[in-house]
């Protein structure tokens, strides 16, 4: 019985962090990729600053374009959505 519980816990921990990526467009030297990640976190501690839900999701785009034979232009945008914010605070994130 205890072995089954350990197997369920290990499986749950491995599934708590999921990331995916997909190529949206790739033609004539122009490429656009979409990627994302979801991480489910919960900290149990006596420190009030670190205790609680720290779940977040990340969404991003990467792009490339062939300018000429020797030069490639690229761009990158990424945003973090915090799952533990209440509605009054809104979502906080970062752009890179």
Curated annotation (Swiss-Prot):
InterPro entries: Gram-neg_bact_OMP, Porin_dom_sf, Porin_gammaproteobac, Porin_Gram-ve. May be missing up to 300 C-terminal residues compared to other porins. This is Protein YddL. GO terms for cellular component: cell outer membrane. It comes from the Bacteria. GO terms for biological process: monoatomic ion transmembrane transport. Residues 1-21 form the signal peptide. GO terms for molecular function: porin activity. PANTHER family: OUTER MEMBRANE PORIN F-RELATED, PROTEIN YDDL-RELATED. It holds the Pfam family Porin_1. Keywords: Signal.
